[in-house]
């Protein structure tokens, strides 16, 4: 006989042994199995996660710095049939602590070997990469035990020589410096980004304003086009209305003109008849008497003209007769004067200087009259002289200068005439 055994999902049931010396093994996870009494063996192995805390103390790194590293690993037995059989071969019958001890030693060994290939900075600054290397190196070894590494992380890294502390201070200073630089660069980038954002905002605003202005302009253009079209239609309508009104006014005016023409024709006919009547009346009242009066005046004018012609002819004859008489008289006087001049010339030739003297003396009154003509218009002559005998001296001087003036005017030298020589000598 036998019994039925069950197992939960966190354990694996291994049934081994059978009749007739069979070595078949049955691995059951989360199920049941039949086991024969006395000839079958049943064992259990846990499938739960096992937490390990590997620790490597004073392990020298690639630079020879001794550090201590602690980690946390999560491992479990794999449920694959073949790998589960391997795990059962390795750990079946062992407690969880024994299994954890085996795996822990394996992980610590790999952790120690990897620490020797890295620097402190690589281990300290990039723990994830360090953990990944440990996991990759240790996974094949623990896998051959049927164990799977679910996770492995570095918990702590420290040393006894304050190397990491000094490195941390340096790193802190560098980080602080980088932080300050980062802050400055961030502020710079923020300022640049803010300026770019403002520029983009202004560009967007300007673009929006431009589009708004374009839209407004398009709207205004469309309004203007619509208004122009409306105004054009209104103008065309108004023009058509005015044209029709003008045509109607023209028709009315033509009819009025026709009426005026008819009225004017009637008026002209009446005026023509009135003119004919007036002409007949004028002929009867004015023309006939005027013609009679004109004939009368014409006859009177012809009589006056004939009278004036006869009078003019008589006057002309009178003037002609008078002219002929005056011509005869002038001719006789001229002949007498010519004869007188001839006789005078003969006498002047006969008497010589005496005749010339007579002529000069005869001309002296006329010369004196011409010379004194300007003085005739003078009311009074005042001679200023302190001596009364001065007047007679002035008169004598004028008389002494007289022959010179006569000689200049007539060419006759009176100073050579005996009579004047005697007169001037007596005066002297």
From Swiss-Prot:
Lipid anchor positions (S-palmitoyl cysteine): 4, 19-20
Is Lipoprotein one of the keywords UniProt gives this record?
A: yes
- Could you mention a single GO BP entry for this protein? protein localization to plasma membrane
- List the Gene Ontology MF annotations in alphabetical order: protease binding
PTM details?
Palmitoylation may be required for the formation of higher order complexes and for neurite outgrowth in cultured neural stem cells.
Assembly information from the UniProt record: Heterooligomeric complex of flotillins 1 and 2.
| Location(s), subcellular | Membrane; Endosome
Task: Specify one Pfam family.
Answer: Flot
Q: According to its UniProt record, in which tissues is this protein expressed? A: Normally expressed in growing retinal exons of newly differentiated ganglion cells at the retinal margin. After optic nerve injury, expressed in all retinal ganglion cells and retinal axons. Also expressed in endothelial cells, spinal cord, larval and adult skin, muscle processes, thymus and gill macrophages.
Q: Which PANTHER family match?
A: FLOTILLIN-1-RELATED (PTHR13806:SF46), FLOTILLIN-RELATED (PTHR13806)
UniProt keyword Lipoprotein, yes or no? yes
Task: Spell out the CDD domains in the cross-references.
Answer: SPFH_flotillin
Where on the tree of life does the source sit, at the highest rank?
Eukaryota
The Gene Ontology CC terms held by the record are: endocytic vesicle; endosome; flotillin complex
Q: From which source organism is this entry?
A: Carassius auratus
This chain is encoded by the gene named: flot2
Q: Which UniProt keywords apply?
A: Cell adhesion, Endosome, Lipoprotein, Membrane, Palmitate
Which protein, by its recorded name, is this?
A: Flotillin-2
Which InterPro entries is this protein grouped with? Band_7, Band_7/SPFH_dom_sf, Flotillin_C, Flotillin_fam
Q: What induces it?
A: By optic nerve injury.
Task: Give the source lineage, highest ranks first.
Answer: Eukaryota, Metazoa, Chordata, Craniata, Vertebrata
Q: What does this protein do?
A: May play a role in axon growth and regeneration. May be involved in epidermal cell adhesion and epidermal structure and function.
Q: Which SMART domains match?
A: PHB (SM00244)
Family the UniProt entry places it in: Belongs to the band 7/mec-2 family. Flotillin subfamily.
